[in-house]
């Protein structure tokens, strides 16, 4: 049996994706930060085996997707998703959900992607998992498109630079000169892994402060703990990164050394900027396209309106987009010429 259904509305409202198989869709579940209680995997398995085709897809946005859902089974699947909504959205992320058996409420604000952060990774400066969960209620449920990626250090393993909103954990360093033995380990690490802003002078490490990106490689390399991260969790914000057929580009630096409170205020204003640029209609466009449409100065004024910046914060005066060869393809010639 097959039924007629507006799959576009089902996608926008309940996270169902159209399948090339007639009469079928794929449901995906939100996992902010990509970490979930292990027992919820059995819930996903049961959905896949009971109503799907027995398979689970690990999506590029750290979600679990179950293909092969028949249209007539959508209500049953929505009800079966209750543990995900209750344990992740409500209990872990503090999202207000009135009916946990009605399925997901929107797809606009995409699942927040994150690396494992400093709960696991020694290179990470910040707690990406915690931030992902605290930001979830600001991006979901919303009909307006926003792709967010959070990483714990400038290594950017999860590709925050390719997201509408890329959030990168950075750290201010504390240097205790009396502990420095002049071994040069930090200088070598910074030169090899980072930006080369350290040098040895009179047997002690010195830093060119303006060049430091706050990655923390010096902290990992120092055998005497002369370099240590300051306890404040700070972030860098990049905007406008995207893949896509229409002018793919790497995101540009917008804010540096900002606090979590600043990021929360910025996200609220990002959605207001989207609404203004789209005339109140949640049309699918990347943030970079909207910045192009409105201009950076207009964007900056709207997004920073009412935001209380912390003393360390830095703001990009302008952003310059340099398109790559993906559009013109002027460097390509027929083979053999």
From Swiss-Prot:
Q: InterPro entries of this UniProt entry?
A: 4Fe4S_Fe-S-bd (IPR017896), 4Fe4S_Fe_S_CS (IPR017900), NiRdtase/SiRdtase_haem-b_fer (IPR005117), Nit/Sulf_reduc_fer-like_dom_sf (IPR036136), NO2/SO3_Rdtase_4Fe4S_dom (IPR006067), NO2/SO3_Rdtase_4Fe4S_prot (IPR045169), NO2/SO3_Rdtase_4Fe4S_sf (IPR045854), NO2/SO3_Rdtase_FeS/sirohaem_BS (IPR006066)
Q: Which residues form the 4Fe-4S ferredoxin-type domain?
A: 171-200, 203-232
Query: Per the UniProt entry, what are the Gene Ontology biological process annotations, in alphabetical order?
Result: sulfate assimilation
Q: What induces it?
A: By sulfite.
Pathway where it operates: Sulfur metabolism; sulfite reduction
- Spell out the reaction equation it catalyses: hydrogen sulfide + 3 NAD(+) + 3 H2O = sulfite + 3 NADH + 4 H(+)
Give the EC number(s) under which this enzyme is classified.
1.8.1.-
Q: For this protein, what does the record note about how its cofactor is bound?
A: Binds 3 [4Fe-4S] clusters per subunit. Binds 1 siroheme per subunit.
Which PROSITE patterns does the record match to this protein?
Answer: 4FE4S_FER_1, 4FE4S_FER_2, NIR_SIR
GO annotations of cellular component type: cytoplasm
Tell me the keywords, alphabetical order.
4Fe-4S, Cytoplasm, Electron transport, Heme, Iron, Iron-sulfur, Metal-binding, NAD, Oxidoreductase, Repeat, Transport
- In terms of superkingdom, the source organism counts as Bacteria
Q: Which cofactor does it need?
A: [4Fe-4S] cluster; siroheme
Q: Name one GO molecular function term.
A: oxidoreductase activity
Positions contributing to [4Fe-4S] cluster 1 binding: 115, 121, 153, 157
Major localization listed first in the record, in broad terms = cytoplasm
Compartments, record wording = Cytoplasm
| NCBIfam families referenced in this protein's UniProt entry, alphabetically | sulfite_red_C
Give the family this protein belongs to, as stated in its UniProt record: Belongs to the nitrite and sulfite reductase 4Fe-4S domain family.
This molecule's function is given as:
This enzyme catalyzes the hydrogen sulfide production from sulfite. It is strictly anaerobic. It is regulated by electron acceptors rather than by cysteine.
Q: Which PANTHER family match?
A: ANAEROBIC SULFITE REDUCTASE SUBUNIT C, SULFITE REDUCTASE [NADPH] SUBUNIT BETA-RELATED
Specify the protein name.
Anaerobic sulfite reductase subunit C
Name of the coding gene: asrC
């Amino acid at each position: 049996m097959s039924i007629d259904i507006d799959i576009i509305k089902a996608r926008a409202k309940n996270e169902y994706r159209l399948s090339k198989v007639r009469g079928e869709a794929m449901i995906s579940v939100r996992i902010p930060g990509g970490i979930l209680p292990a027992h919820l995997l059995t819930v996903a398995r049961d959905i896949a085996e009971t109503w799907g085709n027995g398979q689970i897809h690990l999506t590029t946005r750290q979600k679990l997707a179950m293909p092969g859902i028949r249209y007539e089974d959508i209500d049953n699947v929505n009800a079966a998703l209750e543990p995900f909504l209750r344990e992740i959205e409500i209990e872990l992320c503090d999202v207000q959900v009135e009916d946990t058996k009605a399925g997901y409420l929107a797809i606009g604000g995409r699942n927040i992607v994150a690396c494992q952060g400093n709960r696991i990774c020694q290179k990470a400066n910040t707690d990406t998992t915690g931030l992902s969960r605290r930001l979830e209620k600001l991006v979901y449920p919303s009909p307006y498109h926003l792709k967010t990626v959070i990483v714990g250090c400038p290594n950017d393993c999860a590709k925050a630079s390719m997201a509408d909103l890329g959030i990168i954990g950075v750290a201010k360093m504390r240097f205790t000169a009396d502990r420095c033995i002049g071994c040069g380990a930090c200088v070598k690490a910074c030169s090899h892994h980072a930006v080369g802003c350290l040098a040895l002078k009179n047997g002690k490490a010195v830093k060119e402060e303006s060049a430091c990106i706050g990655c923390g490689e010096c902290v990992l390399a120092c055998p005497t703990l002369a370099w240590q991260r300051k306890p404040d969790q700070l972030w860098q914000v990049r905007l406008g990164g995207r893949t896509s057929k229409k002018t793919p580009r790497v995101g540009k630096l917008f804010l540096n050394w900002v606090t979590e409170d600043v990021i929360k205020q910025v996200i609220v204003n990002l959605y207001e900027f989207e609404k203004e640029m789209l005339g109140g209609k949640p049309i699918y466009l990347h943030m970079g396209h909207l910045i192009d449409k409105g201009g950076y100065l207009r964007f900056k004024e709207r997004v920073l309106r009412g935001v209380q910046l912390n003393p360390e914060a830095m703001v990009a005066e302008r952003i310059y987009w340099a398109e790559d060869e993906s559009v013109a393809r002027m460097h390509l010639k027929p083979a053999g010429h």
